[in-house]
């Protein structure tokens, strides 16, 4: 399969690239600073904070699917998920590429957005501790980040593309296990963490699962 991976040098992106190569995929890897990418990929330099769809056309052209691990590395980059995803979606529409899988976050199901101005107060998969203790603290601290990710999901839902958004909880650097749990449209009870490597594994796996199109997918170890 021909894959284009955005944010290919980030925490999840590095795992996506490595696992895709190991699985025998033909990989185009897009990054702001692509010097550290492995020799097996076709490297493309792009800054998704400012990129226009036309500038990404060569990166997505001919791809069977696009995977994006785009997200901010600091508060100064809040907004990059929606901005970059809008450019990626536009490039895909021009190139005639339909399948896209992105990384979102577990709290986004309860975050308001233009498309969902009145979301549920709690994600249906969250238990008591998450609903009443952890979520209020995390959501308050990272409100702008989650609003950006919610807008990103709106952009995909309105794009006409065959999208899937993976919503992990707190990310860790543990090894890939493949033993994670998943759920459509909700989070996982007692699902507090998941490794970046397992998120990458799921993102590649859903490419062969057409039932995930138009879905958010919760994941946790």
What are these regions (language model features)?
Residues 113-114, 159, 175-180, 206-215:
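Glycine/proline-rich active-site loop of Rossmann-fold NAD(P)-dependent oxidoreductases
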Residues 30-35:
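N-terminal Rossmann-fold cofactor-binding loop
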Residues 60, 64-67, 77, 101:
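N-terminal Rossmann-like NAD(P) cofactor-binding module of classical short-chain dehydrogenase/reductase
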Residues 3-25:
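N-terminal Rossmann NAD(P)H-binding glycine-rich loop of SDR-like oxidoreductase domains
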Residues 73-102, 108, 151:
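NAD(P)-cofactor binding segment of oxidoreductase domains
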């Amino acid at each position: 399969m021909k894959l284009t991976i955005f944010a290919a040098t980030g925490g999840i992106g590095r795992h996506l690239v490595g696992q895709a190569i190991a699985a025998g995929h033909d990989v185009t890897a897009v990054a702001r600073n692509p010097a550290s990418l492995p020799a097996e990929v076709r490297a493309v330099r792009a800054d998704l904070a400012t990129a226009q769809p036309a500038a990404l056309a060569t990166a997505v052209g001919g791809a069977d699917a696009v995977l994006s691990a785009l997200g901010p590395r600091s508060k100064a980059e809040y907004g990059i998920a929606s901005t970059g995803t809008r450019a990626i979606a536009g490039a895909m529409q021009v190139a005639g590429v339909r399948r896209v899988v992105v990384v979102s976050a577990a709290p986004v199901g309860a975050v308001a957005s233009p498309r969902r101005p009145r979301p549920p107060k709690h994600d249906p998969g969250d238990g008591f501790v998450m609903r009443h203790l952890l979520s209020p603290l995390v959501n308050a601290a990272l409100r702008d980040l989650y609003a950006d990710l919610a807008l990103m999901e709106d952009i995909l839902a309105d794009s006409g593309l065959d999208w899937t958004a993976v919503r992990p909880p707190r990310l860790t650097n543990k090894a890939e296990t493949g033993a994670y749990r998943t759920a459509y449209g909700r989070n996982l009870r007692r699902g507090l963490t998941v490794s970046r490597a397992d998120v990458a594994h799921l993102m590649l796996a859903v490419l062969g699962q057409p039932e995930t199109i138009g879905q958010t997918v919760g994941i946790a170890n």
